[in-house]
């Protein structure tokens, strides 16, 4: 099977804030350059890890433009552009496309719990509104509902620009169905860093990663080694960074990873409510691991 267009190691980029809660655009540009140097394949601003629920539309557009400019065409920019209101999701997708995003990541409608036909119609409207590739984001743990494999596959077959899914269901039956039945140009990406090794061994195409914020080169190497069958290298990398992957979710994402990046001197440690800083206990655990790994 040929390698799908949207493959490899993608970073779910954090959004750095200043102490007054304004966006730190200089830090965003530096982070983007960091990922270019590390060989990250795809950078995704304005997703869950980017605290998208707290970003105004004009802020999202400005962030995307900043990332596109800093990337200089050296890696793909696939912007988060989803919500549970279909009309608004279409507008966000159009905004991202106009801002220069080469693809969009659109989360499944949450809270209102649509039927599978509702999911299909939601993504149909988005696919018909933009020309850029669309990544469906299926994350039942956050949305409270699952986009079935049959619905994802139906969308992939019906629309030329529905080219990937970020599958964060941890449902290996669903993952297997997607991998076995997908069109040849459709990428199946895991949204769980802890599943990279088994996911790639099953034939997955990559990851949209939180840990790639901290260790982008290592996540890319893990994806590449696992995908090529070099399981010795893949297992060695996974074993070394397994605890960090877990600690990134010791409290709600992206609080732990932003704390880690601040400790690494890459951003200021600021959040927008309702997110708040890590507890002292979680900070101690993260500090210990960052020191052990030589990241601070």
UniProtKB/Swiss-Prot annotation:
Domain of life according to the entry: Bacteria
Keyword field contains Amino-acid biosynthesis: yes
Record Pfam families: DHDPS
GO molecular function: 4-hydroxy-tetrahydrodipicolinate synthase activity
Subcellular compartments: Cytoplasm
Example GO BP: lysine biosynthetic process via diaminopimelate
Enzyme Commission number, as recorded: 4.3.3.7
Active site: 137 (proton donor/acceptor), 166 (schiff-base intermediate with substrate)
Reactions that this protein is recorded to catalyse: L-aspartate 4-semialdehyde + pyruvate = (2S,4S)-4-hydroxy-2,3,4,5-tetrahydrodipicolinate + H2O + H(+)
Keyword Lyase attached: yes
Site residues (Part of a proton relay during catalysis), renumbered to this chain: 48, 111
Gene3D superfamilies in the cross-refs: Aldolase class I
Keyword annotations of the record: Amino-acid biosynthesis, Cytoplasm, Diaminopimelate biosynthesis, Lyase, Lysine biosynthesis, Schiff base
Record function comment: Catalyzes the condensation of (S)-aspartate-beta-semialdehyde [(S)-ASA] and pyruvate to 4-hydroxy-tetrahydrodipicolinate (HTPA).
HAMAP family: DapA
Family: Belongs to the DapA family.
Descriptive protein name: 4-hydroxy-tetrahydrodipicolinate synthase
The encoding gene: dapA
């Amino acid at each position: 099977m040929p390698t799908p267009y949207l493959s490899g190691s993608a970073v779910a980029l954090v959004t750095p804030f200043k102490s007054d809660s304004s966006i730190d655009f200089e830090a965003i540009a530096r982070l983007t350059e960091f990922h270019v140097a590390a060989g990250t394949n795809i950078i995704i601003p304005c997703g869950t890890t980017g605290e998208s629920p707290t970003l105004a539309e004009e802020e999202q557009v400005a962030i995307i433009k900043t990332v596109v400019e800093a990337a200089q065409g050296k890696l793909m920019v696939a912007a988060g552009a989803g919500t549970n209101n279909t009309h608004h999701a279409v507008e966000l997708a159009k905004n991202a496309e106009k801002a220069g995003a080469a693809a969009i990541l659109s989360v499944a409608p949450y809270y209102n719990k649509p039927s599978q036909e509702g999911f299909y119609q939601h993504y149909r409207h988005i696919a018909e509104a933009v020309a850029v590739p669309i990544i469906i984001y299926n994350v039942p743990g956050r949305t409270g509902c699952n986009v079935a494999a049959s619905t994802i596959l139906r969308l992939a077959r019906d629309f030329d620009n529905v080219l990937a899914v970020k599958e964060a269901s941890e449902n290996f039956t669903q993952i297997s169905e997607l991998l076995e039945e997908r069109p040849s140009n459709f990428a199946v990406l895991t949204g769980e860093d802890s599943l990279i090794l088994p996911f790639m061994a099953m034939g997955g195409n990559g990851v949209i990663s939180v840990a790639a914020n901290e260790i982008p080169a290592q996540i890319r190497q893990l994806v590449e080694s696992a995908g090529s069958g070099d399981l010795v290298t893949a297992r060695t990398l996974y074993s070394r960074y397994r605890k960090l992957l877990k600690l990134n979710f010791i409290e709600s994402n992206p609080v732990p990873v932003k704390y880690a990046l601040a400790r690494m001197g890459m951003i200021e440690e600021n959040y927008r409510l309702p997110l708040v800083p890590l507890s002292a206990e979680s900070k101690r655990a993260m500090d210990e691991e960052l020191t052990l790994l030589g990241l601070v």
